[in-house]
């Protein structure tokens, strides 16, 4: 792999076909969770991909049994206890979404197993999202005790409708690959054994297509997301505001203790 990607330490890279780059989240022992370094790399790698003249399509997947379990507990605790870390997380969360939206290369996600948090952001913002039947897609923000930020407010209602988006986001309801396809959250669902081959097939077709036409189509369609920028910015700010509150402390504690959270029913909101 070229020096362009040698600075990224949390991912594996390979080129399974001509002009196709595959990025594999590589921390299988923790279901490909992202620490502070991984989160930052995941945010800014899309700028290098955008500038890479040697690739025409990208595959994103996870190593082992999961796509990604999102930010690790260390990141959550830092966001709770350190204002500087919280502001940095807000900035990276913002940049991650816009960097994916603005990346000129078409992105194919191959969603294997659990997809949560920042990993789920990329999985569902991908231009073509392909889930294995055993995929488990869940936005766990409200279960943790913070508002659903990331990009859910701008893409879930577009993908599956406002009514279903509210149901899934407010209740942190998990969906498998087949259900995600039924709801419109993903482009396709395939048997798990066929997932990587299908993602590669799609990426090769994209790489062989008319590059300007495909990139302009992506750019135009993603204006739906750009128009929702103010809503996205508000949701992410509210998420970060929650990290300074009490609900997230109970959410994290209950998760570590493997029990249901018991939140104070009173709220000034």
Regions found by a protein language model. Give the residues of each.
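Conserved CoA-thioester-binding segment of acyl-CoA-metabolizing enzymes
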Residues: 1-63, 98
């Amino acid at each position: 792999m070229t020096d362009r990607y040698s600075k990224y330490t949390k991912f594996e890279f390979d080129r399974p076909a001509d002009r196709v780059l595959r990025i594999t989240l590589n921390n299988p022992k923790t279901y490909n969770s992202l620490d502070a370094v991984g989160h930052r790399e995941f945010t800014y790698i899309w700028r290098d991909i955008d500038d890479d003249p040697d690739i025409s399509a990208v595959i994103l997947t996870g190593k082992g049994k999961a796509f990604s379990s999102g930010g690790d507990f260390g990141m959550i605790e830092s966001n709770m206890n350190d204002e500087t870390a919280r502001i940095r997380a807000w900035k990276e969360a913002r940049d991650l979404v816009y960097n994916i939206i603005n990346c000129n290369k078409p992105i194919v996600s191959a969603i294997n197993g659990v997809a949560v948090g920042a990993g789920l952001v990329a999985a569902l913002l991908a231009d073509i999202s392909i889930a294995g039947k055993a995929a488990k897609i869940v936005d766990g923000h409200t279960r943790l005790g913070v508002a659903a930020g990331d990009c859910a407010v701008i893409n879930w209602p577009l993908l599956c409708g406002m009514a279903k988006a509210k149901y899934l986001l407010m209740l942190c309801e998990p969906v498998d690959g087949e259900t995600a396809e039924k709801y419109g959250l993903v482009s396709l669902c395939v048997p798990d054994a066929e997932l990587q081959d299908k993602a590669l097939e799609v990426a090769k077709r994209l790489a062989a297509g008319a590059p300007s036409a495909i990139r302009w189509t992506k750019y135009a369609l993603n204006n739906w997301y750009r128009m929702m920028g103010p809503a996205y910015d508000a949701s992410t700010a509210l998420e970060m505001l929650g990290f300074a509150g009490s609900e997230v402390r109970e959410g994290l504690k209950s998760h570590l203790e493997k029990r249901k959270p018991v939140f104070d029913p009173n709220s000034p909101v």
